[in-house]
């Protein structure tokens, strides 16, 4: 429900979040689920699933120095981790890059891969862990801009990354 309010309502009324918190404290998690709230959860789950399907459809593949990269676009409804997990389930690659609507970059690797993702994230001013890293682009990225942004990312990796 909190995700519904945060992601699907452009200006979430704090009173709805406050009421949810009070109801959860008083009635417990199950007791606070009114029919209206159950419907909101269904709507959120449906829209989230649609967005995850769109993430997979947006995948572009490229190869750098013998390694397969999959890059995909995700709107703010899903996290970089959720988007990456869905792409990993559906696309074979060594490295997965999720470009978020807010300009965030999420790097993940295949479980069998030994590629250290930190140097990749460093190219974009980010960091993290060898298996999961992140960075940020300057500004938001629209679906329309994704093609151009993915080409820029490819060029930066091709010219600056040493496996």
Segments (PLM) and residue ranges:
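Glycine-rich, Lys/Arg-enriched anion-binding loops that position phosphate/diphosphate groups
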Residues: 1-81
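Gly/His-enriched, cation/cofactor- and phosphate-binding structural elements
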Residues: 48-163
């Amino acid at each position: 429900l909190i995700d519904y309010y945060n992601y699907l309502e452009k200006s979430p009324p704090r009173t709805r979040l406050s009421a949810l918190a009070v109801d959860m404290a008083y009635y417990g998690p199950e007791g606070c689920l009114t029919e209206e709230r159950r419907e909101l959860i269904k709507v959120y789950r449906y829209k989230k699933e649609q967005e995850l399907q769109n993430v997979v459809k947006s995948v572009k593949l490229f190869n750098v120095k013998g390694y397969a990269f999959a890059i995909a676009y995700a709107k703010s409804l899903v996290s970089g981790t959720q988007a990456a997990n869905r792409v990993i389930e559906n696309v074979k690659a060594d490295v997965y890059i999720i470009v978020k609507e807010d300009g965030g970059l999420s790097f993940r690797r295949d479980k069998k891969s030994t590629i250290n993702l930190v140097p990749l994230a460093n190219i974009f001013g980010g960091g993290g862990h060898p298996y999961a890293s992140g960075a940020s682009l300057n500004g938001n990225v629209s679906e329309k801009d994704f093609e151009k942004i993915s080409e820029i990312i490819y060029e930066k990796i091709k010219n600056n990354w040493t496996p």
